[in-house]
C-alpha cells in the first residue's frame, strides 16, 4: 500500500491537466499523488478514516486534491468527472453495496459520476490469471483454486474474468 511502484498502474495513462478525476477506494494514496500530478482536479474517496489520513499526509502538498471519507454509495458528490478510477475496489463491492446485484449497482453509481465523454478505469485481479491455474493462492483468500472454482461459500470478495467484467459493465448501463 505504500510502494511508489503502485503508481505505475496509471502513470502511463494520458490524463491531462484539464481533466478531473474521481478516485474510489484511494486507500493510503499509492496512486493519488500520480493522479494529482497528471490531472487538474482529483477527488479521492476512502471508506477508512485511517487510510484517508495517511493519504492526506502523503499528499498534503497537492493543492488540487480533495479527500472524502465514507461510503460513496451514501454520498452525492454533485459533480461529474472526466475519469472515475476504481483500483482494487470492485472485488469488495458486495461488502459495501446493498442489493442482489452489488457489482452492477456499484458500477452504475460510478457511471453517474462520469461526464458524457468520461472514462471508467478499473483495475482488478484477473480471476483466470495463469498463476491461479498453476496453484497460486487466490490473492484475497489465500486459498488455491478458490476463484477459478467460483468462490464456493464466499460472500465478501470476488474477482472476475474479462468476459464476466464485460457482462457486469453492460448490466450497469455502460455500452
Identify what each model region corresponds to.
Residues 155-173:
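Short alpha-helix
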Residues 61-72:
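Conserved SAM-binding strand-loop segment of SAM-dependent methyltransferases
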Residues 48-50:
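Conserved SAM/SAH-binding beta-strand->alpha-helix loop
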Residues 76-84:
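A short acidic, Gly/Pro-enriched loop at the edge of an enzyme's catalytic core
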Residues 17-27, 121-144:
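Conserved class I S-adenosyl-L-methionine
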Residues 28-39:
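Conserved SAM-binding loop of SAM-dependent methyltransferases across substrates and taxa
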Residues 101-119:
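A short glycine-rich, Lys/Arg-flanked "PGG" loop and its adjoining helix->strand segment in the class I
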Amino acid at each position: 500500500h505504500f510502494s511508489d511502484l503502485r503508481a505505475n498502474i496509471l502513470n502511463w495513462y494520458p490524463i491531462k491537466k484539464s481533466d478531473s478525476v474521481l478516485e474510489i477506494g484511494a486507500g493510503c494514496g499509492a496512486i493519488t499523488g500520480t493522479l494529482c500530478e497528471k490531472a487538474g482536479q482529483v477527488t479521492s474517496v476512502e471508506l477508512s478514516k485511517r487510510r484517508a489520513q495517511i493519504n492526506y499526509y502523503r499528499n498534503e502538498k497537492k493543492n488540487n486534491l480533495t479527500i472524502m471519507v465514507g461510503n460513496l454509495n451514501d454520498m452525492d458528490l454533485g459533480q461529474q468527472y472526466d475519469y472515475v478510477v476504481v483500483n482494487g475496489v470492485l472485488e469488495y463491492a458486495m461488502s459495501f453495496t446493498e442489493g442482489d446485484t452489488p457489482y452492477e449497482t456499484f458500477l452504475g453509481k460510478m457511471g453517474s459520476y462520469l461526464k458524457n465523454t468520461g472514462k471508467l478505469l478499473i483495475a482488478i485481479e484477473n480471476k483466470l490469471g495463469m498463476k491461479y491455474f498453476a496453484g497460486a493462492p487466490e490473492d484475497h483468500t489465500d486459498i488455491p483454486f478458490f476463484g477459478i472454482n467460483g468462490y464456493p461459500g464466499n460472500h465478501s470478495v470476488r474477482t472476475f474474468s474479462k468476459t464476466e467484467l464485460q457482462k457486469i459493465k453492460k448490466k450497469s448501463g455502460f455500452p
